[in-house]
Regions:
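Glycine-rich beta-to-alpha transition loops that act as phosphate-gripper elements at the mouths
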Residues: 18-21, 62-68, 84-87, 104-110, ...
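A charged, well-structured terminal subsegment
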Residues: 138-143, 187
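Glycine-rich phosphate-binding active-site loops on the catalytic face of alpha/beta enzymes
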Residues: 80-91, 124-133, 166-189
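Short catalytic-loop micro-motif centered on adjacent basic/acidic residues
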Residues: 38-41, 82-83, 124-125, 150
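Short acidic, glycine/proline-enriched helix-loop-strand junctions
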Residues: 57-58, 95-104, 144-152
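Catalytic cores of alpha/beta
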Residues: 67-77, 110-119, 142, 155-171
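Histidine/lysine/aspartate-rich catalytic loop segments that bind and position anionic ligands
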Residues: 88-131
Length: 200
């Protein structure tokens, strides 16, 4: 298990940034770090990955990967984790060859089980709000408690404890922590999110 994966299990909060501007993404990443999140998924391109990978004690995850070519570019830019928004099995070869862990996404129980079968350490469950939040996680894990699932998609701070108590290993947080917020507000909200996760 790599340090990036260990950190997700420890913090239980996985920070996601969806910003086109690399400078803005860099600012948000620093706010996440100050608030206690060390594993950060970037969906805003290679330039942002390169910049954020330079932040000390931060593990950059490259999000939105569909093709092997995208994965290779992310690794070259400094990504320590590969993340696909779909069940893209072809990426397991890149992950195995590079020894960079891979997170695949699932919506159905069959997809989640298929991801587990190829030894994906964490399975992103997306979009959790539309699937039924904590109730869906409970139902999904009832027959498959061996799955490490991380719900993402419109998750708010008040959803954190119910999702974790339902059996999720971590929760992905996106724009709710930074959209329309100042740097200090993002730090404060991030600290709240991390604190909530530790109470679960």
């Amino acid at each position: 298990m790599t340090q990036a994966i260990k950190e997700i299990f420890k913090t239980k909060i996985y920070g996601i940034i969806r910003e086109d501007d690399p400078e803005k993404a860099y600012e948000i990443a620093n706010a996440y770090k100050e608030g206690g999140i060390k594993v950060i998924e970037i969906n805003s391109g290679i330039d942002a990955i390169k910049k954020i990978a330079q932040i000390e004690d931060i593990y950059v995850a490259q999000g939105g990967i569909i093709t092997s070519e995208q994965a290779h570019k992310g690794i070259e830019a400094g990504a320590k984790l590969l993340v696909s928004p779909i069940l893209q099995m072809g990426l397991t070869k890149v992950s195995s060859a590079s020894k960079i862990p891979l997170i695949l996404s699932a919506t159905t129980p069959n997809e989640a089980y298929s991801a587990w079968k190829v030894r994906v350490p964490i399975i992103k469950i997306f979009p959790i709000k539309d699937l039924g939040c904590s109730t869906y996680i409970e139902d999904l894990l009832r027959p498959m408690r061996f799955l490490n699932v991380m719900p993402c998609g419109s998750v708010k701070i008040e959803h954190i404890r119910p999702l974790l108590n339902a059996g999720a290993c971590a929760v992905g947080m996106v724009r709710g922590l930074y959209l329309g917020k100042s740097y200090d507000e993002t730090v404060k909200l991030t600290k709240e999110a991390v604190s909530e996760a530790q109470k679960a």
